[in-house]
Amino acid sequence: MPASIPRRNIVGKEKKSRILTKPCVIEYEGQIVGYGSKELRVETISCWLARTIIQTKHYSRRFVNNSYLHLGVFSGRDLVGVLQWGYALNPNSGRRVVLETDNRGYMELNRMWLHDDMPRNSESRAISYALKVIRLLYPSVEWVQSFADERCGRAGVVYQASNFDFIGSHESTFYELDGEWYHEITMNAIKRGGQRGVYLRANKERAVVHKFNQYRYIRFLNKRARKRLNTKLFKVQPYPK
């Protein structure tokens, strides 16, 4: 065993997260493009690349048009994940969660995918590094949110490990048709549904209806925003199991 590598940093049968180099800001041609270490870092990538990976790797097989910050997760020279950040499905809904929030005052983690072979805790580290990038590139963002989908069989373990606050859940209806999943908004919103909505409505009788909980998590980036949480609708609660 090389003396230069501490025993605690060696990856064995358990996929233990390791940091062998100090995380730092990553710049390219004088511009901030990411944050992290050689072993794990996030960097901005093109929209088309992020969408391609999400379409092929994410369980939903669908990207979100509202995303405008696309971060690749790298280990060494390998691209091992993608995080897409942007507006909520309804961009103006941020002010309903945190009072006095405009569209540029928050972000939603729309999509996240990380390779299964990555060490344990890699997802929470990637989120942590992404938040540092957001603070640097989008200083007007005061808070971020994301949803854990019950379809994945978990209640948001990754967000709990990333020190997000759990502020409630709601039940959403999904339609399963010909191997594709459709959110209820695709059925109900004529303009937003597009051709997928047209197809779903035309074949509604064949679709299988599912109801799943979606768990809402929020991470405040400053204390002022925390004080403006709309406590009439949301409150910080114990983590769901």
Curated annotation (Swiss-Prot):
Q: Does the keyword GTP-binding apply?
A: no
Residue numbers binding Fe cation: 59, 149, 159
Q: How is the cofactor bound?
A: Mn(2+), Zn(2+), Mg(2+), Ca(2+), Co(2+) and Cu(2+) showed undetectable interaction.
> What cofactor is this protein dependent on?
Fe(2+); Fe(3+)
Kindly state which reaction or reactions the protein catalyses: a 2'-deoxyadenosine in DNA + acetyl-CoA + AH2 + NH4(+) + O2 = a N(6)-methylcarbamoyl-2'-deoxyadenosine in DNA + A + CoA + 2 H2O + H(+)
Major location (coarse): host cell
Q: What does this protein do?
A: Iron-binding protein that performs methylcarbamoylation of adenine using acetyl CoA. This chemical modificaltion makes the viral DNA resistant to a variety of host type I and type II restriction enzymes by modifying approximately 15% of DNA adenine residues. The modification called momylation changes adenine for N6-methylcarbamoyl adenine and occurs just before packaging. Target sequences are 5'-(C or G)-A-(Cor G)-N-(C or T)-3'. Also usually modifies adenine residues in the host cellular DNA.
What is stated as this protein's family in its record? Answer: Belongs to the mulikevirus mom protein family.
Spell out the protein name for this chain: Methylcarbamoylase mom
To which species is this protein native?
Answer: Escherichia phage Mu
Lineage here is: Viruses, Duplodnaviria, Heunggongvirae, Uroviricota, Caudoviricetes
Its gene?
mom
